[in-house]
Amino acid sequence: MSESFAQLFEESLKVLETRQGSIVSGTVVAIQKGFVLVDAGLKSESAIPVAEFLNAQGELEIQVGDTVNVALDAVEDGFGETKLSREKAVRHESWIELEKAYEEKATVIGLIXGKVKGGFTVELNGVRAFLPGSLVDTRPAREADHLLGKELEFKVIKLDQKRNNVVVSRRAVIESENSQEREQVLENLVEGSEVKGVVKNLTEYGAFVDLGGVDGLLHITDMAWKRVKHPSEIVNVGDEVTVKVLKFDKDRTRVSLGLKQLGQDPWAAIAENHPVNSKLTGKVTNLTDYGCFVEILDGVEGLVHVSEMDWTNKNIHPSKVVSLGDTVEVMVLEIDEERRRISLGLKQCKANPWTQFADTHNKGDKVTGKIKSITDFGIFIGLEGGIDGLVHLSDISWSISGEEAVRQYKKGDEVSAVVLAVDAVKERISLGIKQLEEDPFNNFVAINKKGAVVSATVVEADAKGAKVELAGGVEGYIRSADLTSEVAVGDVVEAKYTGVDRKSRIVHLSVKAKDQAEEAAAVASVNNKQEDIVIPNAMAEAFKAAKGE
């Protein structure tokens, strides 16, 4: 009973999590022109405009494989698709951060976007706040237009999410900055120097470190050389850390910090130490539909694309090959130092069945296998090593068309074939079934000399001529001009072999030429017999007189 209740409770939580307006976690599966495709594990993937993933500088903040929070606009819209919004999720997260900053009296970063009656509007990561003119500075300022477009620190002094009302103060920040400790820290800050601080706050994009009255931003991309999904993987609130000052804008009191810069960049000599085609051992750190990520060095992850996982199955799911945490051997296929990307291959560390086949088989060798599939263009036969060879329609039979011959076979049949060609690079093997027997056309040409009289059966006839079949299924043709009488399908005719068209594999025949040759031979035979007869003188003279000699 308790298990049933627990199950119902779990299902109710899932329903709540997928209600319209809820925030869900999704994975970036593709970045297309104008849209980012996100899979949140719902009914369908959702296309979100790229504009919702751009930062203030107009730069794309994500890449394929990243996990992002998105708001559920609709579980199913009018087209049966899930509709997600990154913009609403960012706004939701911003409200949470604003509430936290308000409670802890922490500073927030915002952009003074415009001037309104009584003050300015400030953009706080998707949330619009109001900055009263009296709270712009510690001293009354008649003209503060020079602040427009500037990114500054503020303190939240009023917050009402229901009414979408946020009031901030720049003066409060300035007043808190006017301390002796702060001045001392600012005086000693130098780009490139190492300083100590305490982690004050964590956000999705990084951590704020208190350097002693001055907050510095340790961005998530500067925490480690490897990919970091969330700052909590590296630091936690209250941690004392040593960081490097990357940038220091004294006028704006902006400090950018780095943690990974304290160590050596693992990408610095990666191409030299691990060139293309070299092999390494690494650990599987992430699985996606398009491949898996393998950490080959501390801080260096490479992608094994799904097409580089198995020699014979190009579309196999990565989870069928490796598991999270597996130690695997990979080969370096490509290195892009500028973009800090490395392409790896799993299958390249295993024997290549295509190369093995090429090494052990020559043109003309006989192979046997079962038919795996039959297509419009031929028959695929399974060979050793899990690879396939193709028998093209034109290589099935000498005597009948491929379309007719292929009907004699079915999936699962065991057949023999001859190796015609092997291309291990393109992973192609050409096979032939008809090559198991001698070519009847070539045999005919070799056995019969031009001028020989052969027997043929009429298979087609029209006004232009007759198509005939010779011994062994060889195709012949007799033009109507070379026929002495009408013929019908099934008639057997004797004809003279007059020529051959090797390209079309047709033997040309002539009944008329055969008959003419026979008549000429008969006349010659009669003349020869007449010359052999001895005629008496009287009769001879009479014979000559009759002939007018």
Curated annotation (Swiss-Prot):
Gene coding for it: rpsA
Domain S1 motif positions: 21-87, 105-171, 192-260, 277-347, 364-434, 451-512
Protein's name in the database: Small ribosomal subunit protein bS1
Superkingdom, taxonomy of origin: Bacteria
SUPFAM superfamilies per the UniProt record, alphabetical: Nucleic acid-binding proteins
The keyword Ribosomal protein is assigned to this record: yes
Organism: Haemophilus influenzae (strain ATCC 51907 / DSM 11121 / KW20 / Rd)
Keywords: Repeat, Ribonucleoprotein, Ribosomal protein, RNA-binding
PANTHER family linked to this entry: 30S RIBOSOMAL PROTEIN S1 (PTHR10724), SMALL RIBOSOMAL SUBUNIT PROTEIN BS1C (PTHR10724:SF7)
Single annotated GO MF: mRNA binding
GO cellular component: cytosolic small ribosomal subunit
Biological process, per Gene Ontology: translation
Family membership: Belongs to the bacterial ribosomal protein bS1 family.
InterPro entries attached to this UniProt entry: NA-bd_OB-fold (IPR012340), Ribos_protein_bS1-like (IPR050437), Ribosomal_bS1 (IPR000110), Ribosomal_protein_S1-like (IPR035104), S1_domain (IPR003029)
Function: Binds mRNA; thus facilitating recognition of the initiation point. It is needed to translate mRNA with a short Shine-Dalgarno (SD) purine-rich sequence.
One Pfam family hit: S1
